[in-house]
């Protein structure tokens, strides 16, 4: 890795659990890292306590991690930006940073989701609002924030429209013995896998909440990857992407481990709780709740059959309960795999 990359700062926008975990990972590798969040009270607490006790307690910030209170200042610190905010506010954040962007800024994001109310990929949102002059990259894969921040082994996929940006981003991560990145050329597939897996994870949680067991959960994972692959093919994604980190890897992790908010949310739905009660119980953003509607809209627009996604949408937005969904899926007409 060259000296320029080794000393290049990075600005992380979003100080929730995942944004903080990524900022810790970069700064632990020695990169000057600037972390900005929208809530000044939360940021003041991070600055004083030098850890994110709200989301990642007892994990101290490395010395290279700097807290930024002002957005303009945060953007001025680095050429490279990493956006890690919930998908339903992603467009708003792009609007906020637009006045402060320089021509040399390069923009990456680790947000997993689709644009609210449209189902558009986040790359489309950026290019509509900012044009196509900035190199872009998306980071996605099977990562829980707590494990990443703790330095446990993690692997992830990175897709970019600029080879140099991808290689330099990869070089940053590969300073660590515990954090590995695989470059992928398929930005559409990497974005899509990270978004739709949250919806499938809700269905897997619902199944477990109803006590259906491991067989049913595995069937949902398998048929879920088929849904994601069909939708991806209609949008021009590479089918192989969905067998990698940002596809099957992230899907299996999110559907099977109780660290997953989407899975826990689904479990509560399966147990008969309302969506609002489940959201309140989890206390953090459940991306799959927002993405179910957007994924359903995107599938309808593309003319792609996605029965699991549709049934989750029906539960969240049309008043169905989990038992109705199970009956609908099991009662579908016979077909080949």
UniProtKB/Swiss-Prot annotation:
Localization recorded for this chain is: Cytoplasm
What's this chain's function? Catalyzes the reduction of the glycolytic intermediate dihydroxyacetone phosphate (DHAP) to sn-glycerol 3-phosphate (G3P), the key precursor for phospholipid synthesis.
Biological process (GO) annotations held by this record are: carbohydrate metabolic process; glycerol-3-phosphate biosynthetic process; glycerol-3-phosphate catabolic process; glycerophospholipid biosynthetic process
Q: Which UniProt keywords apply?
A: Cytoplasm, Lipid biosynthesis, Lipid metabolism, NAD, NADP, Nucleotide-binding, Oxidoreductase, Phospholipid biosynthesis, Phospholipid metabolism
InterPro entries from the UniProt entry: 6-PGluconate_DH-like_C_sf, 6PGD_dom2, G3P_DH_NAD-dep, G3P_DH_NAD-dep_C, G3P_DH_NAD-dep_N, NAD(P)-bd_dom_sf
**Annotated active site:** 197
Provide one Gene Ontology cellular component: cytosol
Coiled-coil zones: none
Superkingdom: Bacteria
Q: Which residues are noted in the entry as sn-glycerol 3-phosphate-binding? A: 112, 141, 143, 197, 250, 260-262
Q: What is the E.C. number? A: 1.1.1.94
Q: Where does NADPH bind?
A: 17-18, 38, 112, 145, 261, 285, 287
Keyword Cytoplasm tagged: yes
The record's listing under PROSITE patterns reads: NAD_G3PDH
PANTHER family noted in UniProt: GLYCEROL-3-PHOSPHATE DEHYDROGENASE (PTHR11728), GLYCEROL-3-PHOSPHATE DEHYDROGENASE [NAD(+)] 2, CHLOROPLASTIC (PTHR11728:SF1)
Descriptive protein name? Glycerol-3-phosphate dehydrogenase [NAD(P)+]
Concerning NCBIfam families, the annotation shows: PRK00094.1-1 (NF000939), PRK00094.1-2 (NF000940), PRK00094.1-4 (NF000942)
Gene name as annotated: gpsA
Pathway-wise, it operates in: Membrane lipid metabolism; glycerophospholipid metabolism
């Amino acid at each position: 890795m060259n000296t320029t990359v080794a000393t290049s700062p990075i600005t992380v926008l979003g100080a929730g659990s995942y944004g903080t975990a990524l900022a810790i990972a970069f700064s632990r590798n020695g990169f000057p890292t600037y972390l900005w969040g929208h809530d000044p009270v939360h940021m003041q607490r991070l600055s004083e306590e030098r850890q994110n006790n709200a989301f990642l307690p007892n994990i101290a910030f490395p010395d290279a991690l700097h807290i930024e209170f002002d957005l303009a200042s945060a953007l001025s610190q680095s050429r490279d930006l990493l956006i890690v905010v919930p998908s339903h506010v992603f467009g708003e954040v792009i609007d906020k940073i637009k006045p402060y962007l320089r021509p040399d800024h390069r923009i990456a994001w680790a947000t997993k989701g689709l644009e609210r109310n449209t189902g558009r990929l986040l790359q489309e949102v950026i290019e509509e609002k900012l044009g196509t002059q900035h190199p872009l990259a998306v980071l996605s894969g099977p990562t829980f924030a707590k494990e990443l921040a703790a330095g446990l082994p993690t692997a992830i996929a990175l897709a970019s429209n600029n080879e140099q940006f991808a290689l330099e981003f990869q070089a940053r991560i590969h300073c660590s013995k515990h954090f590995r990145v695989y470059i992928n050329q398929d930005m559409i597939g990497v974005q899509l896998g990270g978004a739709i897996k949250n919806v499938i994870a809700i269905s897997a949680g619902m199944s477990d909440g109803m006590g259906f067991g491991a067989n049913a959960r595995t069937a949902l994972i398998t048929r879920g990857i088929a849904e994601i692959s069909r939708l991806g093919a209609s949008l021009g994604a590479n089918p192989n992407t969905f067998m990698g980190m940002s596809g099957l890897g992230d899907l299996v992790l999110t559907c099977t481990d109780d660290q997953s908010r989407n899975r826990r949310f689904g479990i509560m739905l399966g147990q008969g709780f309302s969506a609002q009660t489940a959201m309140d119980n989890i206390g953090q953003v459940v991306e799959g709740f927002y993405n179910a509607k957007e994924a359903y809209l995107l599938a309808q627009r593309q003319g792609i059959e996605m029965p699991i996604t549709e049934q989750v949408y029906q539960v969240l937005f049309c008043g169905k309960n989990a038992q109705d969904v199970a009956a609908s899926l099991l009662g579908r007409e016979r077909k080949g795999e």
